[in-house]
Structures are given as structure tokens and as C-alpha cells.
Amino acid sequence: MENKHRRAAALEAAAIFFLACLYGFWPVPDVNEPYYVGKAIHFWNPDYFAQDPFLTSADSHYLFYAVFGFFSLFLKPAALVWFGRAAIWLFTSFGWQRLSSALLPRPGFSILTAAAFFFYIEHFHLAGEWVIGGVEGKGIAFPFLFWGLALFVRRRYTGAFILMGIASAFHVLVGGWGVLAALGSLALSAAGRKARKEAGGEPASGKGKELLIGLAAGGVISLAGLLPALALDRGASPEVQHQAHFIYVYERIAHHLVPSTLPWTFRVRFLLLTLVWLFFCRFKPNGSEEARAAWRRWNRFVAVSLAVAGAGLFWDYGIPLLVKAGLLTDGSVSADLLRFYWFRLSDWTVPAGVALGSCAAAAALGENAGFSVLGKKFFPVFLPLLFTGGIIFIAAKKLFLAHALAVARAATVSPFFPAAPKPVDAIALLAAILVFGICFLAIKRIGGAQRRIGALSNAALAMVTGTLALVMPAWGAAEMTAMKSGVLVPRSNPPKESISNGWLDVCRWAQENTSEESVFLVPRGYESWKWHARRAEIANWKEIPQDASSMVRWYALMEDLYTTGVKKGKSRWNDPLIAVLLAKGEKRIARQAEKYHIDYIVAEQPPYNIGSQPKVKERFDEMVEKHRVYQNQHFIVLKFEHENLQGE
């Protein structure tokens, strides 16, 4: 029987792995992969871009670089990425299967929960968190966290916290926040037990020794991730540390750390998803008291993650209010606090909670209604309800929220069936489900014809939960399949296919026609230069050093190279590199090339209307005549000879 269960678990993990491939597949390199993979290769081979300022900066994910980078001794970069993706997605599949089975021990249901989880985290995150993606430190941390939580909800605390310690070693924030949320869940459980004990209820848990052993062992293991992170500010003055924190939070990573800077749709969709999770918190699964206790521990874990996010919201919104009220003199302290990614935990726990809760509720409602999900009564009873849920989704999206947004934005109303999932579609669906769910819960409480109302409410709840558990994930998987079957451009390249091809052409030219020691300046947001051209670059917006001193120097360099010094605020970063070069003029650019030892500059071709601006056209022609060595339809390469600049 044990072997049978293991084979079933392996088959479920294989199916989840297929879903992970569907959501995670993108051409190499994906977002952040040049960053993490480059660091990992450089860890074992210091000669790999030895002159690159980012790769030679301090390492914050030491264990990940040490373990993953070891395979770079045998594999080329592209093969290394595919090996890493396959390993991470496979480990994640097994980890999720363990967590799902710990809460919902039904054959095959971990596949349904995985499909729902991948869908909800893809479309309803607040601050950009993901679980299935490219090769980086948090990707390998999540499987250990999931596995640890599977043990945690079963009260096997020694193994749980050891696994969470391993997760922390690979990524201190992913694992560390998980440990704190687990401890918060235990604290809530202890408070509940104390209240029940005082009322003559249950005794103490008797798991203290096991818990301490797990925390001690996991804490020691986590030092592999914690100590490098703590060392990042070492040697920097308090002023430099604070400046680095401000740069990191408000200038570079605000889209992950500062919700007030995000589009309002991000906040609305996450709020709606949180309300859906609260809706499923009322659900009590069938089974033993032990099974219900596991769900309580999981729900408390999610609740603590939301409390953590609430603290982050206070640092973001509350501190400015305190300053305005005169209760706080320095509002910049928020940067020192927000840098700890307060929304990273809830960004995945709430989607996971909805995925697990909706699937469990749908299964229980099916049993209570007298039909099995895979039984004979499924097709005549459950499928029409799911179809109705899909119709509600389309109607709500078309007639209500999408129309309101179109009016507000003075845009055309989107079509009935969108070509790809969009935040508006997802928000509309959740809003519709919430409205119907609240209505049917209210109907259930009305006295009178109890049997008819009970049948109606059960059918409606089955429709709501089935739509959440099956219709939405299936829709997302279908749209993802359609998108991935088309022409894909690496997300680290320029987004448009023609521009991406031009980018690859200029990268190939650089690799074939410049020395390996050459240093380039390239457009600010193009992160795949080193990957394709195999040449170093002086700076990159994506590749922000992690130690405080290097971060401050990096930011000053970015300001000097990528802004004109005229514009202020965030808009100063909006100009393409060619516009910055034309604003500075050839002599100033040459001086900067000499100062920073830049051999080549890769810039976008100027816009077609440059001919209507004589002075700008004159500057461009002068620059091209003196420095151009290559160009294609989209990019131009300028070469600077440093020896000719002495004395300027």
C-alpha cells in the first residue's frame, strides 16, 4: 500500500511538473536569469567577466551560487539554465504535492490545487511575487518551504523547521518569513488552547521539545543565508546604509516593496482575492479532528502572512501620515523598514489559500450533494453549474467592470473573449463570484422553505467553488497554452520581436568583432547583453549590487550615464539612451567613456523625426561620423578610443 501511495504521489508530481513547464517556459534567458546565473558562474570561475562591476560585487545568495554554480563547470550557460529550471520545477512539484496532500489527501487533487495556485499567483499577486519562473535563489527555496509546511500542518515540527531552515539558507527572505509565519501560527494556536484550557477544554500540546530541536537545527542551517545578508551593510557608515536603503526601496525595487506606487488594479485584485480566502475560512472540511486541525494551522499561517503585509502597508501609508500629523519627524525611516519585502509572503499564501480552499470546498460540497467529482452524477449536475459560472464570468467582465474601466479610461470596451488573461478579466471574475457567494450565504440564513433554500444555496456554492477551483484555472491554462504556442521573445530582451532580433544581431556583432576585455554601455533596461554578447557592461538597471557601498556607487553611475541632469523625479529615467547621448553631446560622452573605461556604446537608432530638429541632427551626424562602427535597423554601435582622449 505504501508503494502504491508513493507511485500515485510521483504521478501527481509529474502532472504538476507539466503545469509548471507550461507556466514557466520562456526562451532563455528569462527575467533575472542573466543576474543569478551570471553570479553563479562567476562564483566558481572568477575569470568569467572579471572586469564586470556587478559580478565582482558582494554575493547575497551565497549557498545558491555555490551549489548551482558548481554545475557551470560542466554545462554551458544555456544548458545550465535548462538544467536549473527542470530541477527547480521538479522539486517545486514534489513540494507542492506534499503540502496539498497534507491538507487535502485525495487522489489527484494536488494537480487541481497546483493548477489553481499557479493561476492565482500569476494573475492576482500584489507585489510581483512568483513561484514558477526562471533560475534564481527563491526558486529553489520554495520547494523546501512547501515541504516544511506539509510537515508543519501535521505537527511534525522538527522536520518542518529544518526544511524551512534549508529554504532560508537558499533565500533568507522566502524561508525567513515562512519561519516567522509558522511561529505566529503556533502562537495563535497556543492562545486558543489557553482559552479552551481555562474553559475546561484541551490540554497542552506536548510538542515543545520537538519544536525547540527543529528551531535550533533549522536556525543553524539558515545561517548560510542569513550571515551573507547581514554582511552586506558591513563597513558602510549609517548615512551610506540609509542612502542605499532609500535607493533600493524607492528608486529601484518600488514595484515589489511599495504598494502605493503600484497600479490600483493590483491593489483591488489582491483585496478581492483576500476576501475570497476569508470566504473559504468558514469552510470546515470533512474528516477527522486532526484533519480540521491541520486546516486551522494552515489558515493561521495565511492570516499571519496578511498581518505581516498589514505592517508593510502601515510603513508605506501610515508613516507619511504620522509625519504630516507631527508625530514623527523623519519619514525616511520607512525605507529602512520596507526593504524587508513585507508583501512577499502574502503574495503566495493568499493564492495558495484560495486554491486549496476552493478545491477542498468543491469536493466537500460534491459529497454532501450526493455526487462524486468523478462519479456518474458529475456530468448532469456539476458541469452545468460550472458552465453557468463561466457565463457569469463573461457577463460580469463584459457588462460591468470592463465597461466601467473603459468609460473611466475613455477606451473601447474589450471583446467578450480576451486574447490573453488580463487583470481586468480576473478582477471581474472574482468580483462576480464574491457577489454571488455573499448573496447565497445570505439566502441560506433565511427562514422558510428550508429544503428548497438549502438545495439552492448548495447548488450556488458548488457553482462558486467549482468556478474558482476548476473554471478559472482551466481558462488560465488554456490561455497560457495559446500564448506559449506562438512566437516567444525572451523576457530579458526588448519585447517586440523585430527589435529583439535587432538586439540579437548587435550582440552577435559585438561577440565576433570586439575583444573579450571590451566594456560596453547599453540601453538601461536591456538585461541580456552579457548573455548574448559575452561582453562586460559598465552598468545595468537590473543588476543592482546588494551591499550598501556598491549600491550607492552604482546609483551615482546610473544617474551620470543614463540621465541628462535636466529632468527630475522618476521621469528622468524615461529617455532612451540615444536621447540622453544627443542631449549630452559628443564631447561630454567621450569624457564619460574615458572616465569609466567604456570602449563601446550601443544605443537605439534615433526616431524618424530627428530631421526636423537641425541641431539634434547635427549632433547625431557628428557622433556617427567619428564613432560609428556598426548599425542595423534598430541599434547603432559607437566606438571610443581612450588613447585619443588624453588631454581633453
Please name every model-derived segment:
Residues 96-124:
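Transmembrane-helix signature of polytopic, membrane-embedded enzymes
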Residues 52, 74-94:
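Loop-to-helix entry region of an early transmembrane alpha helix in multi-pass inner-membrane enzymes
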Residues 149-151, 158-175, 183, 216-220, ...:
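Membrane-interface alpha helices of multi-pass inner-membrane proteins
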Residues 140-159, 186, 192-196:
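Membrane-interface transmembrane helices that cradle and orient dolichyl/undecaprenyl
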Residues 304, 308, 312-342, 349-352, ...:
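Transmembrane helical bundles and short interhelical boundary loops of multi-pass, membrane-embedded
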Residues 470-486, 496-579, 586, 590-610:
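Short periplasmic/luminal acceptor-recognition loop of GT-C membrane glycosyltransferases, typified by
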Residues 37-39, 54-77, 167:
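Short hydrophobic/aromatic helix or loop-helix immediately within or flanking a transmembrane segment
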Residues 20-37, 44-45, 49, 53-61, ...:
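Transmembrane catalytic cores of multi-pass membrane glycosyltransferases
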